[in-house]
């Protein structure tokens, strides 16, 4: 069996390395040819994991269509806003395609699974999402990690033996939508938690943001037709807790920099990698307006990042909203 990984960034490379023990070959493709060259010449992804020697069965492929043709299972690990334009250029027969990307397409408000279905023209039963609390730098070092594979359970059950390793445990779920929404929106809430930390608001505020943020995620899961209970699993609560508290979280780090007074441009530059929550919050803002639902935390993050609202003022607006029950009727 051959695995094809589309996107050789930090997460794509980590998945290629940890799963290489289960495949004869792991082929990787990336738009950045320098990354592929470094893997080809030294078995090291110098840009993202310069301290990790990759297994020798990980092989760079410079033509995306070739990688698709010679792979039995595909994992897509590229920024959400570039998935459609990348996959629309290739053809694929029905084979499992797993999204490890997290986000919502800004223009269409569609999830990654919908983008892949439209771009690739394959049966939806072959489309999956891999999501959960999983920092790439820990996964690639073989530190214990548990995630969830969401999609068609009949096909998914057959994939588990190829995705599980001694240190990488994969559970199965039939809620593709719920897993995708959780993985996408948690980045926005993590930015909020980071802003709070950057302002020095402490542990109480962070815990409150995470908890109320989870409620916002459940609202969006329901709107997209997923199971709200999914938010209490690895792809929801698990991923949110990690991303909102972990020192390796790009979204939390970005938020902290904003809270400390850096401009958006300065913060993005200092992080140095894709901050998915920065673009996802634009989609969440549109979802809020389209469906007329209250998403107060996400809304304040949007205002801070795109309307130059002072982070302290945003926090005060959250704290001084009208009195409410903890859990309101749906979509209120």
UniProtKB/Swiss-Prot annotation:
Protein's cellular compartments: Cytoplasm
Entry keywords, A to Z: Cytoplasm, Lipid biosynthesis, Lipid metabolism, NAD, NADP, Nucleotide-binding, Oxidoreductase, Phospholipid biosynthesis, Phospholipid metabolism
GO molecular function, one term: NAD binding
Annotated function: Catalyzes the reduction of the glycolytic intermediate dihydroxyacetone phosphate (DHAP) to sn-glycerol 3-phosphate (G3P), the key precursor for phospholipid synthesis.
Enzyme class: oxidoreductase
Catalysed reactions, semicolon-separated: sn-glycerol 3-phosphate + NAD(+) = dihydroxyacetone phosphate + NADH + H(+); sn-glycerol 3-phosphate + NADP(+) = dihydroxyacetone phosphate + NADPH + H(+)
Database matches in HAMAP family: NAD_Glyc3P_dehydrog (MF_00394)
Gene: gpsA
Name this protein carries in UniProt: Glycerol-3-phosphate dehydrogenase [NAD(P)+]
Binding site for NADPH: 10-11, 102, 136, 250, 274, 276
Residues annotated as catalytic: 186
The keyword Nucleotide-binding is annotated on this UniProt entry: yes
Cited InterPro entries: 6-PGluconate_DH-like_C_sf (IPR008927), 6PGD_dom2 (IPR013328), G3P_DH_NAD-dep (IPR006168), G3P_DH_NAD-dep_C (IPR006109), G3P_DH_NAD-dep_N (IPR011128), NAD(P)-bd_dom_sf (IPR036291)
A Gene Ontology cellular-component term: cytosol
Family to which this protein belongs: Belongs to the NAD-dependent glycerol-3-phosphate dehydrogenase family.
Residues the entry annotates as binding sn-glycerol 3-phosphate: 102, 132, 134, 186, 239, 249-251
Record-listed E.C. numbers: 1.1.1.94
GO biological process: carbohydrate metabolic process; glycerol-3-phosphate biosynthetic process; glycerol-3-phosphate catabolic process; glycerophospholipid metabolic process; phospholipid biosynthetic process
Pathway per the UniProt entry: Membrane lipid metabolism; glycerophospholipid metabolism
A Pfam family recorded for this sequence: NAD_Gly3P_dh_C
